[in-house]
Curated annotation (Swiss-Prot):
NCBIfam families membership: PRK03759.1
Protein name stated in the entry: Isopentenyl-diphosphate Delta-isomerase
Pathway: Isoprenoid biosynthesis; dimethylallyl diphosphate biosynthesis; dimethylallyl diphosphate from isopentenyl diphosphate: step 1/1
Bound cofactor: record note: Binds 1 Mg(2+) ion per subunit. The magnesium ion binds only when substrate is bound.
The organism of origin for this protein: Aliivibrio fischeri (strain ATCC 700601 / ES114) (Vibrio fischeri)
């Protein structure tokens, strides 16, 4: 099945659609979302990170947020987040209304293979203490709960371990969680 992305302008207004790979080849601004699930433990918050599969056409073998993708045409980002949690890691217990939508940011980054990310990226979070998962090997090679300390340590020591968008997503999530606690 050919996948399409929703092209947007700098204000976030939809202006068309394009095949996903072509949009990444041309570096055109399009809608995306990043889901980051977290849980509270006795030692603090932990975040569920995925390691992107070796077969992904960009950012392969990089640690990133729980899941990320692009909403389909006329698909709400929270519904898309729920859909991709199921498709990527087999999580079915998170409903669209459980997400807190932190809004969006725009970023652009050159990737390997001559591709470019240029996304209006919505950040969706949910506190999910008890989730089970089944990895889709075409999407994800590993999944782990990471403490704040472990993420910070790895981002300082080995920043290339993570996808280019993850540090921004993570910092925005931390800022939000610190403000509400």
């Amino acid at each position: 099945m050919t996948e399409y992305v929703v092209l947007v302008n700098e204000q976030g207004d939809a202006i068309g659609t394009m095949e996903k790979l072509e949009a990444h080849e041309k570096g055109l601004l399009h809608l995306a979302f990043s889901v980051l699930l977290y849980r509270e433990t006795d030692l603090g918050k932990e975040f569920l990170l995925q390691k992107r599969a070796e077969c992904k056409y960009h950012s392969k073998n990089k640690w990133s947020n729980t899941c990320c993708s692009h909403p389909r045409v006329n698909e709400n980002v929270e519904v898309a987040g729920t859909r991709r949690l199921n498709e990527e890691i087999g999580i079915t217990g998170v409903l669209p209304e459980q997400f807190v939508n932190l809004g969006w940011f725009i970023y652009q980054a050159e990737l390997e293979n001559g591709l470019s990310e240029h996304e209006q990226d919505y950040i969706l979070i949910a506190n999910t203490p008890d989730v089970s998962f089944i990895l889709n090997p075409e999407e994800v090679s590993d999944i782990q709960w990471w403490s704040e300390a472990d993420i910070e340590k790895e981002m300082k020591a080995n920043p290339d371990t993570f996808s280019v968008w993850f540090p921004t997503v993570y910092k925005k999530v931390l800022t939000h969680l610190q403000q509400v606690n």
